[in-house]
Amino acid sequence: MPGQLQLSFVTFKKDAFIVVEGKNNVERFFIINQGKVRISKEVQVVAEEGGNILGPGDFFGVVSSMSSHSHIETARAVTDVVLISVHREQYSELIQKNTPVAMKVILQFSRRLRYLDEALSRLTLKSSALPDISHLFNVAEYYARQSQYKQAFYAYAKYLEHCPSGANAGAARERMMKIAPYVTDVKTSFGPEEFNRMYRKDTMLFAEEEPGDELFVIQKGAVKIVKIVDNKEVLLAVLKAGDIFGEMALLEAKPRVASAIAYEDCQVLAVNRANFQRMIATQSQLIAKLTTLLADRIWFIYKQLANTLITDPAGRLYDILCIQLEKNRIPFNSTASFTFDFGPKELANMVGLPQAEVNSALRKMIEKKKIQIVNNKVHAPMVIEIIKQTESQRKMQKIEEARKEYRAQTIIGL
């Protein structure tokens, strides 16, 4: 019948491979109806929460299917299994008819993303600090030193709101009074019915470590997502109309992991927990977009985490460029050129290596004519050459790892 959701059941025998890491057959994902499935990765970058054996009601392949990127894991049948096969185009209809499935996917994705994001921060940004609401004062101090008074005023206000008797409360009040004459168009709170909001350029929507219970949909303008690490502002993303952000704080009732600042004048729709529950049942397209957004972020962070295990600096740089090409959906067999939207400094932040080490590796890559620096942006004269170099570096790393393992076994045998 037209309009009726039709899902197919598929069976796999014990030990059969269902999906294979790196493959691009990602149109479908699976929900386990009967049996058990083992999930594994070629490089186990971090221990998975919840283990790697899945059973009835669990799902897999959603990250790659909804992000339309290559598989980041291999799924193999532990027993004979019966699976429900869902095409990505059916997801909106599925969640419209089955709200619990939507919530399970979104909540699991949110927890997974936060877990992976914290692991990546430890490895690349070298930040391992536990959540601390008093960090709001440090955020305010940073922006005050940069004479960015709108951001500073907001963070001071939020610090006082949540830490009125904190160790730095007196200093925060004093600083707010000093910078108040230079601050306009800064609103630190909104009423329960103020869902459509306007923000002027450079004003803060929320600050890292601030409690949050709303996600935002950008309707006009742009918002940048930043984090203060080692007393520096690290740019994580610039989001534009149609993008969604702030979802993890809403879904998990945990502090914001980064700050959101208006990159230009912008208009956003704020969605609180009560509205979000209604949206799942009535706004399936928006929920599907949120799922796709989370899936895309998870895929990208997995790739970045795997990148941290590459020991050769040039190998790590080629790999991160390859990841960026796939993220931007550039065909790997393309002989065309491509200019990345970042330069050497941002590249060093991505791979978590010292700038001097990155510059040295880049010089060698430039000498080999694999890349160029054009207007302070990384430029690949031929995309396929980046892919070839990445594959070559990966093979060399595997050979070296095999040699180390052989030497270790030989020593143990002696």
Language-model regions, residue ranges each:
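Short alpha-helical segments that sit at the start of domains
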Residues: 304-329
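Cyclic-nucleotide recognition modules
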Residues: 49-106, 237-291, 299
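Structural motif
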Residues: 36, 81-82, 222, 265-267, ...
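Amphipathic alpha-helical repeat elements characteristic of tetratricopeptide repeat
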Residues: 85, 130-134, 138, 196, ...
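Short, structured interface segments
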Residues: 94, 99-121, 163-183, 287-295
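Regulatory nucleotide-sensing modules
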Residues: 1-42, 179-234
